Curated annotation (Swiss-Prot):
One of its GO terms (cellular component) is ribonucleoprotein complex. The gene is rpmG1. GO terms for molecular function: structural constituent of ribosome. Pfam families: Ribosomal_L33. Belongs to the bacterial ribosomal protein bL33 family. Keywords: Ribonucleoprotein, Ribosomal protein. It comes from Cutibacterium acnes (strain DSM 16379 / KPA171202). It comes from the Bacteria. PANTHER family: 50S RIBOSOMAL PROTEIN L33, CHLOROPLASTIC, LARGE RIBOSOMAL SUBUNIT PROTEIN BL33C. The keyword Ribosomal protein applies. This is Large ribosomal subunit protein bL33A. GO terms for biological process: translation.
Amino acid sequence: MAKKSGDVRPKITLACTECKERNYITKKNRRNNPDRMEMAKFCPRCRKHTAHRETR
């Protein structure tokens, strides 16, 4: 079966705001968080904790 494009829990990619490397893949609930997600995560390229923002 094919997945719906308007899925409630889509996979999203989190990219580092400093070096722009895409480090993490996670899921989010579109009903609870309709805007772009931002989290503090460890970036192995920067070697420190930075803000990671959802990419399209």
